[in-house]
Structure formats: C-alpha cells, structure tokens
C-alpha cells in the first residue's frame, strides 16, 4: 500500500523517523487518538501513513478483548470479535490487517512482511503473552514499541517478561485455567486453555526513567500528543533484569495510585 501524501501520512513518517523505527522492522503501536482527532487528524489516513512507512516491514497493533471474551462468553472470532483498545487499533483490525492472532484476551492484528509469522502460534500457549504469542515471537525480530498518547502503562510486552520470569507472581495457577474456543478466518475452531493475568496494581511506567537515562527510550510530541518509543529488546532487557533481582518489582507499592 502506498499512501497519498496527506497531512497524516507526512506526520506518520516524521513520527516514526524521529522515533528511530526502521521501516523494514516490526512496529508495535499502542495509541490513544483522541487528541490527534481533536486537531483534525483522520485515523484512517494516519494508519495508511504508518503502513506506507512500514511497507518493507510489519505493523502490528494489540487488539485486546479480555473485557468481552470471558468464561461466560468463551468464544473469540478472528474476524468478528471487536477490540476495546481504541479507534486506531479497531480500524486497523477491520480494514487493513491481513492477520490476527487467535487468542481470547490478548490478540494482535498485523500487516506486512512478517505478519503471518508473528501471529501464527498465539493459541498454542496457555498464557496471554507466552513465547508462542506475537510478543514472544517479536523477540526474534527487529521490533520497536511506540506508545502514542499513552505511556508504558499500556505496554503489553511487559506482561511477556512477567510470564517468563515470575509466572507464579503474575498469573493464575495452572489449576485455574479457563477454556475458550477461537474461530479462525478460515472457519476452523481451536480450543485452548488459558491462565489469565492476576489483577494486580502494576507500575509499568517506572521503567521509562532508567531507559531514558541510558538513551534507550525516545520521547516527543506529535501535534500536542506525547509519544515514547523504545526497542523491544532494550525494554525487555530492562524488565527481565529488574524481575530477576526482585520478582515483585513490577507491583506498585501499597498506597500507590491504581493504574486503570
């Protein structure tokens, strides 16, 4: 896809260049578009600009469904189950992504060179962000994370580190696994058992300061909307080290504000 030269496509290209995102790599975008929409940015045109910049690589967006796919409603449909993480991710899922991982709570939509590889095995794990998930598969790729209008509190990749280092702290035990059915776009149905994340007050934003101090995280603004960007390798390296020192390092201290 080649985007028309629009305000949004030019802004997307400038943003990704300033964020240090390689056009032939993998980009995970987490976004809140409200401020950009308020100043006239069109979400569809912005997505097309992102896709054009990443035309030799892969664009991925989390398409969470944990609020609606539950033990009381245990069906996930790759094409039909709507996400609840904002307009950009939902438009991308519906109109641009060629692949979506099969997962009842933490699916990922993707477009580009490695979209199939990134999303192929999510349903083979028994946790939301296992090695078989896009977050785990992305560790083998040149992956960057961009947080637009939000901060690390919305960065799903951090859950991957939790699951790898201290699953007993952050996940329900194996005996509490739930049963779900995932329908792929070809109509095939894949049953899976899932251990959900425990509801804990996590302090993901604490990792921004050390990453920034070491020159590993970039910051900026796009039309008044703040952004942060970091390579997934650097991000997970910081968090793996923290969890290996203290498996409860991510949990906010008593009395800390609750991050919704």
Residue ranges and their predicted role:
Residues 44-46, 161-166:
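Short, solvent-exposed amphipathic alpha-helical segments in soluble enzyme
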Residues 70-159:
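Internal, conserved structured core segments that host functional sites
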Residues 30, 159-160:
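Histidine-centered active-site/metal-ligand motif
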Residues 14-20:
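Short amphipathic alpha-helix with an adjacent loop that forms part of the alpha/beta core around
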Residues 165-192:
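Gly/Ser/Thr-rich active-site loops/lids in small-molecule metabolic enzymes
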Residues 20-72:
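N-terminal active-site beta-alpha-beta segment that forms phosphate/nucleotide-binding
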Residues 6-14:
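N-terminal basic/disordered segments at the start of proteins
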Residues 191-260:
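Acidic/aromatic/glycine-rich contiguous surface patches that form carbohydrate-binding/processing clefts
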